[in-house]
Curated annotation (Swiss-Prot):
GO terms for molecular function: methenyltetrahydrofolate cyclohydrolase activity; methylenetetrahydrofolate dehydrogenase (NADP+) activity. Belongs to the tetrahydrofolate dehydrogenase/cyclohydrolase family. Disulfide bonds: none annotated. GO terms for cellular component: cytosol. Pathway: One-carbon metabolism; tetrahydrofolate interconversion. Pfam families: THF_DHG_CYH (PF00763), THF_DHG_CYH_C (PF02882). This is Bifunctional protein FolD. Keywords: Amino-acid biosynthesis, Histidine biosynthesis, Hydrolase, Methionine biosynthesis, Multifunctional enzyme, NADP, One-carbon metabolism, Oxidoreductase, Plasmid, Purine biosynthesis. Homodimer. NCBIfam families: PRK14188.1 (NF010785). It catalyses: (6R)-5,10-methylene-5,6,7,8-tetrahydrofolate + NADP(+) = (6R)-5,10-methenyltetrahydrofolate + NADPH; (6R)-5,10-methenyltetrahydrofolate + H2O = (6R)-10-formyltetrahydrofolate + H(+). PROSITE patterns: THF_DHG_CYH_2. PANTHER family: C-1-TETRAHYDROFOLATE SYNTHASE, CYTOPLASMIC, C-1-TETRAHYDROFOLATE SYNTHASE, CYTOPLASMIC-RELATED.
Length: 307
């Protein structure tokens, strides 16, 4: 690792956010308020089961009411929508999360839009997307992964990114597009690119802040990185291990070994963005509980970008 490269520990930052969430939850409980999180999982996909279990454990650790609804793979879409309607009407539930992906016979878009915007802690409802796109961050729920990435960026650069060039590689509705909007709100000059962008490496070399969220293992090579840049690697890819024996290992979308010799700051995979996603899910659930009960919502961004 270069002497000047800072390793951004998402685990440490996530732990500090969880500590804040716990403290605010204790304060709410003094007023008889317990944040409630309901997670819906359809089918028995092993990866989804692991994700849901980790979210449930973290919610309980934070002192939340944590409820899991497990539905069979062949559940009718109507039944899923009815469950969401009942959770929308349940005052003890402040956040609703539907674990994706859903089976093919279920319209994921319809399901996401059925969640009340006030309980849409994933930030996928059109109303929350629109608020983020127009800069109404005070009342928007921001998708958890870009929200976490933004806090990591703030830890390096502060809340005002004026004069800095940011390149987001990835155009998904879950990470790329909301990430670009958050960077714009912080006054960065933003370019959003993707795997089909011409001369992508040239764009990346101009970035003071480089966000990699394209889902291709080690696509961003070290010589694409501007010396001293901040690199946030959102990718989580499982590839064959360098050792024999058929083992696998996790890598990001960035060539990490090369990046640490060139970047000013970089997130590792694992241990970078991943822990931040769950931490921000807990933060959004807490904020939803505060809003539902006319309580002041806490700050989680270093400069109040996320409230």
């Amino acid at each position: 690792m270069s002497i000047g490269c800072k390793l951004i520990s998402g685990r440490e930052v996530a732990e500090s956010i969880i500590d804040q969430v716990k403290a605010h939850t204790v304060a709410l409980s003094a007023n008889g308020i317990t944040p409630g999180l309901a997670v819906i999982i359809v089918g028995s996909d092993p990866a989804s089961q692991v994700y849901v279990a980790s979210k449930g454990r973290k919610a309980e650790e934070c002192g939340f009411l944590s409820i899991k609804h497990e539905l069979p793979h062949d559940v009718p879409e109507r039944r899923l929508l009815e469950l969401i309607d009942s959770l929308n009407a349940d005052p003890s539930i402040h956040g609703i999360l539907v674990q994706l992906p859903l089976p093919r016979h279920v319209d994921s878009g319809k399901v996401i839009q059925a969640i009340s915007p006030q309980k849409d802690i994933d930030g996928f409802h059109f109303i929350n997307v629109g608020k983020l796109g127009t800069g109404a961050l005070e009342t928007a729920f921001v998708p958890c992964t870009p929200a976490g990435c933004m806090i990591l960026v703030e830890r390096i650069h502060g809340k005002d990114l004026s004069g800095l060039s940011a390149v987001v590689v990835g155009r998904s509705n879950i990470v790329g597009k909301p990430m670009a909007n958050l960077l714009l709100a912080a006054n960065a000059t933003v370019t959003i690119a993707h795997s089909r962008t011409a001369n992508l490496e040239v764009l990346c070399r101009q970035a003071d802040i480089l966000i990699a969220a394209v889902g291709r293992p080690e696509m961003i090579r070290s010589d694409w990185i501007k010396p001293g840049a901040t690199v946030i690697d959102v990718g989580i890819n499982r590839i064959a291990s360098r050792d024999d024996g058929g083992k696998t290992r996790l890598v990001g979308d960035v060539d990490f070994d090369g990046a640490v010799e060139r970047a000013g700051a970089v997130t590792p995979v694992p241990g970078g963005v991943g822990p931040m996603t769950i931490a921000m899910l807990m933060a959004n659930t807490l904020r939803a509980a505060c809003h539902a009960n006319d309580e002041p919502a806490p700050h989680f961004g270093s400069g109040g970008v996320l409230r």
